[in-house]
């Protein structure tokens, strides 16, 4: 009986090792996999769950920039696109919308806060990757701090229980952007114009952590493949499980507005983008393990 049980367990683990990237359209499948596989085959401290928030956290803001729209709308809006895409500050449009209360923010998965809390309460390390920028943003001293507080206050999403002894890390070994670097703050990695897989790997190296099972949730198949490659080069002892989150509502045409709506929205955003300010002097101390340079902003 014991041999039969052991064989079944080994079969499960072997199937996971050989598993391709798993397609999911909701958190339900991932939650079920934890109950059936991961929680039974791994200790909590041997797991690491990484959620990439881009296109996963919030439903579409309804801004037709960097998102798919049909050819008819694109041609009608082409003159506006031509104007706004020449502005180098366009890269900050997502952060601009996040910090503006005029735009509605709605979770893509209403159960996401419970998912994060369940992982944390089970002592399973879970962190997030935000494809945004760090440092000063308009009247916000440190955007990465604002973002972590915003998620906790407004959506009860809190990643800070994971790696509490490493609540802030400035990755100044990576390339700087506007005198800022990628940052890990209270469970959230902000990539700051660096490929997410590279920042995640640097995080693992910085905290000297090699999980037995690395679980990545992302809407980007390219990122999943890249992360798998990076981990294979880092350690042959890490089992990589990738969940390709492909919620159809992300690109569902029924939510698209008419041309007048898009025209008004873009025209409203243009002056906000033009007025956007960032003021990030070089770090006085370039040591990532130095005193927390963010304390004065709390």
Swiss-Prot record:
Residues 279-298 have a biased composition (Low complexity). Residues 278-298 are annotated as: Disordered. InterPro entries: DUF2608. It holds the Pfam family DUF2608. Residues 1-19 form the signal peptide. Keywords: Signal. To R.prowazekii RP296. This is Uncharacterized protein RP295. It comes from Rickettsia prowazekii (strain Madrid E).
